Amino acid sequence: MKIIFTEDVRGKGRRGEIKELPDGYANFLIKQNKAKQANAQAMSQLKGQKRAEARKEAEELEEAKKFKELLESGERVVEMKAKAGTDGRLFGSITSKQISQELEKQYGMKIDKRKMELREPIRTMGYVNVPVKLHNEVTAKIRVHISEK
C-alpha cells in the first residue's frame, strides 16, 4: 500500500515522504496517525503543502537578506563602553548578549544572541566585526566599537 508519512517514523520514512509499505504495517501507521493513504486528494494536498513551505522558505531568505542590508548599510557601529586597564585590555569581557542588547538600544534592531557567531567574548578595546547568522545562506557582520569608560 502506498502511504504518505505525516510524521517522522524512525527507520521507515520522514514527514511528507511517499513510500510503498506492506498493508499490515501501513494500516498500523494510519491508525497511529503517523501516515495516511496516498490517494489523489492526499497527493494534491501534499503538493500544496510543499509549495507553501517553499514559498515560506523563500520569504524568510528575502527577509534575512533585507535585514543584512539594514545591518551593513551605512556606518552602523554599535558603540560600547567598558572599564579597561592601561594596556587596552578590558576588566571582564563583552559577550554576545551585551552586543545584542546594545544593538536593540541604539538602533532598535532585535537579534537573538545565539545567532551571533562570537567564538569567545571580546576582551580588548577597538573595532571588532561580529558575524551574525541570519539564515542558513545569509551571514551579516555587525561592527562593534569598544571604548574606555
From Swiss-Prot:
One of its GO terms (biological process) is translation. GO terms for cellular component: ribonucleoprotein complex; ribosome. SUPFAM superfamilies: L9 N-domain-like (SSF55658), Ribosomal protein L9 C-domain (SSF55653). Keywords: Ribonucleoprotein, Ribosomal protein, RNA-binding, rRNA-binding. It comes from the Bacteria. GO terms for molecular function: rRNA binding; structural constituent of ribosome. Signal peptide: none annotated. It holds the Pfam family Ribosomal_L9_C. Binds to the 23S rRNA. Belongs to the bacterial ribosomal protein bL9 family. This is Large ribosomal subunit protein bL9.
